[in-house]
């Protein structure tokens, strides 16, 4: 007897279903594998990838001794790669632009690369760390990509991150000093709106919402 066997698709991804053997020569032999961990059909050599432990195995095809002929064996190898899985998260989002660095929480397969869209986010491609001060305020989608390898396709995990511009403002009363007969002294404000106005020491009549001062009272 004589035979050859091979798994021409090796390496296989663990999610690829079934790996079938290419066999030539004498039929009727049995298949076995070492080390333990490979789910293989002893009669036809089919390998169930999803229930096999990722790794490299030696598969042996054995034809029993018969008709005066000695036992015959031939071998081949098969490699199974675990399907990469990963999640990413920016737990502190939204961040203020003056908060330094935003770090990512990543689980699963390491070694991927980080990208972001749209443009404007300063992100470290290797670590996923975001430099907030040099990033434009807005909301971004960050993608963590594990490249295709070992028969497995590329895997992409995504997360969102939002950055708010730090509050900043200046105020001035351009007409100061005012005469006590003036009834309305408006404030000149630049920067972030929506704040409230107050004064010290006590004695100034000021509108907390607009900042307008009434010197006459």
Regions found by a protein language model. Name each.
Residues 1-16, 21-28, 190-194, 202, ...:
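Low-complexity/repetitive intrinsically disordered segments
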Residues 1-8, 83-91, 166-174:
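Proline-enriched interdomain boundary motifs that mark the N-terminal boundary
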Residues 13, 66-73, 96, 149-156, ...:
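Short, exposed coil/turn segments at beta-strand boundaries within extracellular/luminal domains
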Residues 14, 30-44, 48, 111-131, ...:
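Low-complexity "stalk/linker" and mucin-like segments enriched in Ser/Thr/Pro/Ala/Gly
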Residues 16-25, 99-108, 181-191:
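A short beta-strand segment in extracellular, disulfide-stabilized domains
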Residues 51-55, 134-138, 215-217:
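Surface-exposed, short loops/turns at beta-strand junctions within beta-sandwich domains
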Residues 55-65, 138-148:
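A short beta-strand micro-motif common to beta-rich folds, especially ectodomain repeats
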Residues 76-82, 159-165:
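Interdomain boundary/hinge segments at the C-termini of tandem beta-sandwich modules
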């Amino acid at each position: 007897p004589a035979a050859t066997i091979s798994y021409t698709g090796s390496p296989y991804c663990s999610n690829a279903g079934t790996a079938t053997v290419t066999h030539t020569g004498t039929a009727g032999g049995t298949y076995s594998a070492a080390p333990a961990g490979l789910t293989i059909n002893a009669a036809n050599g089919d390998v169930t990838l999803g229930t096999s432990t990722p790794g490299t195995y030696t598969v042996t095809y054995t034809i029993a001794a018969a008709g005066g002929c000695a036992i015959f064996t031939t071998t081949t190898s098969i490699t199974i790669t675990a399907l990469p899985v990963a999640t990413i998260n920016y737990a502190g989002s939204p961040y203020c632009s003056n908060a330094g660095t935003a770090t990512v929480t990543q689980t699963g397969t390491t070694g991927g690369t980080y990208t972001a869209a749209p443009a404007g986010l300063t992100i470290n491609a290797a670590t996923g760390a975001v430099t907030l001060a040099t990033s434009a305020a807005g909301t971004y989608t960050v993608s963590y990509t594990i490249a295709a390898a070992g028969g497995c396709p590329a895997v992409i995990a995504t997360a969102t991150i939002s950055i708010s511009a730090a509050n900043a403002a200046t105020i001035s009363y351009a007409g100061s000093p005012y005469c006590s007969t003036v009834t309305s002294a408006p404030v000149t404000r630049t920067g972030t709106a929506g704040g409230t106005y107050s004064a010290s020491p006590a004695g100034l009549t000021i509108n907390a919402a607009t900042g307008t001062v009434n010197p006459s009272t």
